[in-house]
Amino acid sequence: MAKVESTLDYSEAFETEQGTKIKPFKLLTRLYRDHVGKVAMSALYYTIKASPIWVLSIVTANIINIVSYPDRHSMREFWINLAVIVVVIIQNIPTHTLHISYISKAVRHVEAGLRSTLVRKMQQLSLSYHGDMNAGRLQSKILRDVEAIDFLSRQMLMTIIPAAINLIIVIGLTLYNSWIVALFFVLMAPMSIFLVRFFRSKMSQRNRDVRRNIEEMSGKVSETVEMIPVTRAHGLEEVEIRKVDSALQNIREKGHRLDVLEAYFGSSSWVVFQLFQVGCLFFTAYLAHLGYMEIGDIVMYQSFFNMIIGSVSSILNVYPNLVKGFESLHSVTEVLLSKETEEYKGRKNPERIQGAYRFEGVGFQYKGSDRHVLDEFTLEVKPGETVAFVGESGSGKSTILNLIIGFFKPQFGNIYIDGIPMSELSMRKYRQSLAIVLQNNILFSGTIRENITYGLPHISEEKLQQAIWMANLQDVIDSLPDGLDTSVGEHGGRLSGGQRQRIAIARALVRDPQIIILDEATSALDNMSERHVQQAMEQLMKGRTTFIVAHRLSTVKNADRIVVMKKGKVIESGSYDELLGMKGEFYKLKNL
């Protein structure tokens, strides 16, 4: 399995480009640099498999000349030409299959690799990046843009490269037979280049506009789906429908303008090439009239010119799709080359995290905010201690938890874990020592068993059952027809809030973590569910360093220490009874 994953990771190809801009075509070559051999083999087999179209033109001309000028040719030539064309046509079956096979291997691998690399990069990007980037837009990049890049790759390998091969061979054959006719053919190139340059910038901009509108629409649809319970509860369905309709209207209008521009491009190229084809017919006929060629040669050159027109037309016809593909390449670079990754780059891997924390003058400010949400925050926590943070909304409680998890990095001050600066720790190793239970825990689509053992496929049944018992979850499992193998639905939608919380606690327990983080873990529960979850949490917290954020002050009564926060600073600290005895800020919060 590890080998498969490594071959799908293109991250190294973009390491030196982080934070820079890379041209789409350069990006495409990076993606295919490990598949040059496959591309070369597909081009070779295309050249062989496509040979009938060139040979048939020559054979047709030869047959016409043989029957038109019997005094100059023998019937032996007739039969040789027939044998050649039959053999050349039959070989198309194996060579065409090999041509497509090599293309498919390369394209399928790049498509899977690009999606895998985007997902890897998303896992590395900071939470602030994900906060700024709508999930629907990211989904659009991974699905729609990669699909467009896949289509671009196929157009390049199955249209552009074959067309280029056709042009080289046909012009070469024409040059071999008549340099005058070859020169006439080459005159078509400047007009083709002019057409592309004339339409290129307009098509690129309109494709960009359409792509951005589709990303915005994807974000709106994603948000609308998530908000259905709220909108329905308030009777605001029409408001959401109008929002999506407005986004769709923008896509419709800009898409229509793009379609019209592509129509102008297609019709202009068709008119130009038809005029050239008429010119070729009269030019070669005039040369035959002067005695420079035989009648069959007119047919051959006309056939060659049709091939040239077909090749150039195929390039120009797919050009709008190429523009879309290159715009999608530009789109994925917004993710692949982003520098907004997690800031911690430490490499230290302690054997075991004990759970001692020291915050020294820590300060943090959110992007776009004009004040520090934490200011000179200082605190020391002993291993196995339970510390609860309370205070008004915006006082910095949840920010502290995000700093402990490593989602954020202090702008100033330091955090030490077991005496080691947090910046020197490997975040992956450190987070394996954490368990987090949130107010709204995310469950994955799947069974209860899969959610509890997430990331631990080889956990023993004994440990699993122990975690279920400690999480007070057994009665829930016994009440379900499929027990542990019951599907929870999307985001756990088939379960109650209390049931989801206990599954989250079981998921934490089965990992045997050293540090527990509880963020409003019971605030959304009714009294009965809260009692069950509270009992499970007590099992979870035993002997472990625990950080709690809660608005219900009754839930922090048993904490070893309660830290009262206000405007990013510690204003009180002590046990529940000590703080009540002070009759300070905690006392006020308790009596609100």
Label each region the model flagged:
Residues 1-53, 68-81, 98-103, 107, ...:
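Membrane-integrated ABC transporters
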Residues 5-19, 108, 116-140, 144-146, ...:
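Short intracellular "coupling" helices and adjacent cytoplasmic loop segments at the cytosolic face
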Residues 33-34, 127-128, 144-153, 157, ...:
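An intracellular "coupling" helix at the cytosolic face of ABC transporter transmembrane type-1 domains
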Residues 39-95, 175-180, 292-295:
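Transmembrane helix-loop-helix hairpins at lipid-water interfaces of multipass membrane proteins
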Residues 48-52, 56, 86, 90-103, ...:
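Hydrophobic alpha-helical membrane-associated segments
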Residues 55-61, 87, 91, 157-200, ...:
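A hydrophobic transmembrane-helix motif
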Residues 229, 236, 260, 307-335:
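Cytosolic ends of transmembrane helices, especially the final helix of ABC transmembrane type-1 domains
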Residues 351-592:
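ABC-type nucleotide-binding domain
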